[in-house]
């Protein structure tokens, strides 16, 4: 049974893990264990069971929504007597740093690509629309990286607007976590996919976040279905620190890495720095700008230890 809170009206239906898993309804798992290992993040435990119980039901739900949207487009074309343009279905994925947004996005890209109705699924992260480090330094915003003011929101909104307008070819800038900066001339080309997955901290922001400029257009205005990946902050901080330590042993050891100096730190000092980065930047951004957007999502998936999703809330 779906949980219904009798004492408090809510716009969401709530499912525990078992209830949600039952909604898979015989959808086959088309990914192998080796493929799943390639898709998961550096700090996540992702099992075949997790994919089958959580992400297959989600891909089934999204397939229903996307098919419904295609039928609506066909009705409009019939009414207008036109062939119409191919308009991608945009899925937004939001949540804190270290919560596993990228893994969720990559998994959905792989699963949705396997549905026969829509094979073309593109994935874009909003990191590419951060201002280059040169600009952030000039504006004194390097310690606000990931905050709303650190993004080129005009370019991001323009990109999503062009995609939803049916433009045949749209380019998006690419971000490198190795150099901690936007890649010069590293654009990714998007050519009318069936589905565009847009993953980032800020995809659910709206005019409510900018009362001084309520008439601004936002990314969320162009998103058809949005997912917020949630977890308690103490888990998020722990995941962030563990990820930092793994990067210190791996990616940071690359001489080209922006954080190469961190690879030489003793572990206690590395933990202190990661904790400081969380408290002064990522945790602050979560509380001020990311968490307040959670209840705007079409679906909220809440994680417990080991990145296992323990419940799902679906907007009615």
UniProtKB/Swiss-Prot annotation:
It is found in: Cytoplasm. Its main location: cytoplasm. It is an enzyme of class 2 (transferase). One of its GO terms (molecular function) is pantothenate kinase activity. The keyword Transferase applies. The keyword Translocase does not apply. Pathway: Cofactor biosynthesis; coenzyme A biosynthesis; CoA from (R)-pantothenate: step 1/5. It comes from the Bacteria. It catalyses: (R)-pantothenate + ATP = (R)-4'-phosphopantothenate + ADP + H(+). GO terms for biological process: coenzyme A biosynthetic process. One of its GO terms (cellular component) is cytoplasm. Keywords: ATP-binding, Coenzyme A biosynthesis, Cytoplasm, Kinase, Nucleotide-binding, Transferase. ATP binds at residues 95-102. Its EC number is 2.7.1.33. Belongs to the prokaryotic pantothenate kinase family. This is Pantothenate kinase. It comes from Serratia proteamaculans (strain 568). The gene is coaA.
